Amino acid sequence: MKTVILVVIALMVIEVQGDGYLMVRAGIEKGCKIWCVINNDYCNRDCKLKGGTYGYCYFWKLACYCEGLPESSPDIWTYEKNTCSP
């Protein structure tokens, strides 16, 4: 019984983290991925400002990718949130 309680408490303490492309949330590019070419510093800084652990420029997609964001973060780009019109 103590083990079950310990597991439940551990699951409540562990924060679920998500990875994904950073998304523009305002302005003319709202809903688009944050684009980049080779600027890892910019992507890393923006990722950390949004609560992530590490960000980098994913060259093949030309977009900032962020690791360690909270799963419920509104800053992760998904197809459902894609309101970007090229």
UniProtKB/Swiss-Prot annotation:
Gene Ontology terms: biological process: defense response
Cellular component GO terms, alphabetical: extracellular region
Short name of one Pfam family: Toxin_3
Tissue expression profile of the protein: Expressed by the venom gland.
GO MF term list: sodium channel inhibitor activity; toxin activity
Signal peptide: 1-18
Lineage: superkingdom: Eukaryota
Keyword Signal: yes
Main location per the UniProt record: secreted
CDD domains the record matches: neurotoxins_LC_scorpion
Disulfide bonds: 32-84, 36-57, 43-64, 47-66
Compartments where located: Secreted
LCN-type CS-alpha/beta domain residues: 19-85
Keywords: Disulfide bond, Ion channel impairing toxin, Neurotoxin, Secreted, Signal, Toxin, Voltage-gated sodium channel impairing toxin
Function: Binds voltage-independently at site-4 of sodium channels (Nav) and shift the voltage of activation toward more negative potentials thereby affecting sodium channel activation and promoting spontaneous and repetitive firing.
Similarity comment: family membership: Belongs to the long (4 C-C) scorpion toxin superfamily. Sodium channel inhibitor family. Beta subfamily.
UniProt domain comment: Has the structural arrangement of an alpha-helix connected to antiparallel beta-sheets by disulfide bonds (CS-alpha/beta).
Name of the protein: Neurotoxin LmNaTx34.1
